Regions:
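Glycine-rich phosphate-binding loop
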Residues: 60-98
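Short glycine/serine/threonine-rich phosphate/pyrophosphate-binding segments
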Residues: 26-31, 55-56, 75-85, 105, ...
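Short glycine-rich or small-residue beta-strand-to-loop segments that form or flank ligand, phosphate
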Residues: 16-23, 71-73, 124-126
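Anion-binding alpha/beta catalytic cores of soluble intermediary-metabolism enzymes, centered on
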Residues: 1-12
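Glycine-rich phosphate/diphosphate-binding loop of Rossmann-like nucleotide-binding domains
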Residues: 12-57
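Glycine-rich oxoanion-binding loops at beta->alpha junctions
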Residues: 2, 43-64, 108-110, 125-126
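C-terminal binding/interaction regions
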Residues: 63-66, 70, 100, 104-152
Length: 152
């Protein structure tokens, strides 16, 4: 649910944000990210349930992933998906660790630690920080839009 003033004029940016989940348990923080990026004017696209447990689910979506200007990638447990995605695409990737999993991974600590230790170029927000991930993606989308508009 998003509340706005009647006079609010939402921007329509020439930039897209892909919001990716490893599994269904990542849906809530990913949903927050998608809503915030969308409210900031970016076109958004949800790509759900493409975790590393079955890599073909991810590789089947590579063209779709590569079509976006920025990606928010949510994952719990060991948090591997954002690292893998960042190695496969040539756009900014924002890792969104999620507090799912068992044992040490159950509070999102393992996912956060794994993303912070990534050898790929990856930015990371705090555990379950969908709002923050969406806002960061929206800011990147704004800059991409401004660059494209200036080039026209």
């Amino acid at each position: 649910l998003v509340a706005t003033r009647p006079s609010f004029d939402r921007a329509e940016l020439d930039a897209s944000v892909g919001v990716v989940t490893a599994g269904t348990s990542d849906a809530v923080p990913a949903g927050e990210a998608a809503v915030i990026a969308g409210e900031m004017g970016a076109r958004t696209d949800r790509i759900d349930d493409v975790g590393v447990a079955a890599l073909t689910r991810l590789t089947d979506q590579l063209d779709r992933l590569r079509s976006h200007d920025v990606l928010v990638v949510a994952a719990g447990r060991e948090g591997a998906l954002p690292t893998v995605v960042a190695g496969l695409v040539d756009v900014p990737v924002i890792g969104l660790p999620v507090s799912t999993g068992y044992g040490h991974g159950g509070n999102g600590e393992a996912a956060l630690s794994g993303m912070l230790q990534s050898c790929t170029a990856l930015s990371v927000v705090n555990v379950d920080a969908g709002f923050t991930a969406g806002a960061q993606a929206g800011l990147i989308a704004r800059q991409i839009d401004a660059t494209r508009t200036a080039e026209e």
